[in-house]
Amino acid sequence: MTTFINHTNHPSSRWEEGQRQAAEAYGTIIDLPFPRIPADWDAQAVHRLAEENAREILARKPMAVLVQGEFTYTFALVCLLKDAGIAVLSACSERLVRERTDENGEIVRESRFVFRRFRAY
């Protein structure tokens, strides 16, 4: 069984159908929630966590991993997974903005993000 690991703050149960189908093309989706990275951690602490999670991810032998979140952790984890030969992806969305004027005459912008594709790191 091939797997697609979703390592983000966005559970796959809340994805739109297009994103779910694109992920399932790689295999069964497994959610591995993105960790909370304290702002006071130094680079070594972040890298240790990336190494720990890379071991957990690699043990599952995924076909691909979606990684998005705190930048320094994401960079470290992406490098580790790519070095191990794993396809690491980012979700690409289109931002659709609608402007309207509310009852007070204020302009209100409403944004909606629509999944378009995965892009490899």
Regions found by a protein language model. Name each.
Residues M1-P62, A76-C79, D83-Y121:
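Long, low-complexity, Lys/Arg-enriched
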